[in-house]
Amino acid sequence: MNVPEKLPENAFKELKEGEEYEPLMSPKSSYPEVTPWSVTWGILMAVIFSAAAAYLGLKVGQVFEAAIPIAIIAVGVSTASKRKNALGENVIIQSIGACSGAVVAGAIFTLPAIYILQAKYPEISASFLKIFIASLLGGVLGILFLIPFRKYFVKDMHGKYPFPEATATTQVLVSGAKGGGQTKKLLLAGLIGGLYDFVVATFGLWNENVTSRVVGWGTALADKTKVVFKINTGAALFGLGYIVGLRYTLIICLGSAAVWWLIVPGMSFVFHDTVLNNWDASITQTVGSMSAEEIFKYYGKSIGIGGIAMAGIIGVIKSWSIIKNAIVLASKELRGGSASAEKSEAIRTQRDISFRIIAIGSLITLLVIFLFFWFGVMNNLFYAVVGVLLVAIIAFLFTTVAANAIAIVGSNPVSGMTLMTLILASVVLVAVGLNGASGMVAALIMGGVVCTALSMAGAFVTDLKIGYWIGTTPQKQQTWKFLGTLVSAATVGGVMMLLNSTYGFASGQLAAPQANAMAAVIDPLMNGAGAPWLLYGIGALIAIILTWCRVPALAFALGMFIPLELNLPLVVGGAVNWYVTSRSSDAKVNEERGEKGTLIASGFIAGGALMGVVSALLRFAGFDFINQAWLDNPLSQGLSLIAYGALIYCLVRFTKK
């Protein structure tokens, strides 16, 4: 049966009373969806993008959304193989493959902290099995907790939420032949981005970072005033900034500037001869004798952590009515007391996994989590009960926050919510008697489960909205999402262990910023030492003020928390996005150029991140081609700027073709 080439006019508009949305694939007909082709390609996409996203996320703390590149590839391969009626299959490929970003975001923000703390506490054990099980169970829980909210977010709120990522992905899938032609451009961009980052990571052809210390006056400025400028010139980060856009990258950069160019120099000036170590006895230097990086590490980051945590709390408060309404709706359908539930079950495009199966599946998943905590993590019945209760309550409450954030801005504040989980879990576990190294591992595993659940919930609502617009069967998307979660959890566990063995998370090229923050928060709490509550409070106050001023507090707080050199390239990418989409007087031309730029940037991200994994494999195998003497030469940073300029020129040039 032929499918219309364009979405209906009411696809992005609020429906009038009695009006129904008619998707592209008619609810009255059946179409190919779950086939060996779609499942195989979905698994392949999950493996590839899990590896790429894990590398990039551990490097900079930002996980790129794989939905759009996967959709482009799905359309491209189906067009190249001349498959008919492939739209439903492409949605399944995208849905299975998109598990990559969700599982990666959940795992890498928390679980590397186990490795980080292991360096300080050798008795801590980290294994592939623990990482895999925590990621898998968190992903499964996120899917099960999100399904009861599908009808509310996807159908009832149709036209009220913009769903930016789902919109872009749907347009790619619907475009068909256009998407197939785009595949070549995506692959070319991936090749450019991949080679660019590969020659830096593997051969050190030029310096990865450019700093103001490369010149004499910059060194003097950094030593005397603690003001320093740094930027990473990688292709993947530049592409990420382009896709995020100028508004949010500017806010992130403002947060970074506030810490690095105001708070850090200000603390050095005010507390120049003071040792501030009330919460950390290992700090023995005066603030004035520290470098800018050390002041940021010991003080600035904690302000960012407080801001992220408060932004998460504000998100829960704002979403409370959504939680309540969705619970009422789900409970009515679970009891079978709703005529609309029976009607929806009969309509293919409104058919979910049975709520009874969801309830039983949720209980079984929580039981498995309890057994995992009891026998694999805590080795204590009471602690395991406390742990599973905390996981269940927090994951369920924050599910709507994650879905709501994705529906509105396409960004999931999962790191802030996980920080809250860790702080709460640490306080509760210490109160019931579980502390020290074993308490740290327990809290981090709990955080890993919750973080993956929330990340999966946010990502999955995007998939379901795509399916709603196109007309696929939600039940099939939901069922096969579990397979994607399994594959992604296994992949990210392996990549994480590889990268830790090659680089290490505590320092160096894989900073794992979120995981380092988790380790910094949990260590003092679990050892009975103080915590920088005053700094957390300052960050929380900043978040409240920003929210009151209607400025996205989470983006600003992330900027305060993530190192400067990883934030500045984001705003460079965002500025290029603005330039590309505003140069023409013709709005349609600007829109087309913006779409081309998104495609090229996606290629830079995917290629750069994938080749980063290849470079890590070479290092792990013992191949080291880096000449450190060359990287210490200022000319390596000069060459880095030239290469960076060429990369920017390439993207701008491609958008005008």
Summary of predicted features, one role per range:
Residues M1-K657:
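Alpha-helical multipass membrane-protein architecture
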